[in-house]
């Protein structure tokens, strides 16, 4: 799929578990803070509305926070729902591009997108070839693939 924006801003969603401390979270904030706002309409959405980097986002970047607190065992709760159900629970708008930032829960949510016009990207920081790790978040390896 070729993405062309012309006179229209390309709507991009970066979906990440949270903006707590960590290198990946900081890299995401730096990335979106340096994107061309004349070409991209950028939204950062978190599963959990926690983290020290929320206030570091530029004013041009829209932020959507998820649950107000992080709860232990959330991956087990998320396994009760299909990716499509999770996607509908979190993502309320249409986007041209959705970037699942970090492997795991955010990738599972974004994989539930059924809009064929949306380009899906998974920003990985590890390899998911390890079945034990993959099934920690996904129901099984088939769902992880």
Language-model features, listed with the residues they occupy:
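Short His-centered aromatic/hydrophobic patch
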Residues: 100-106, 124
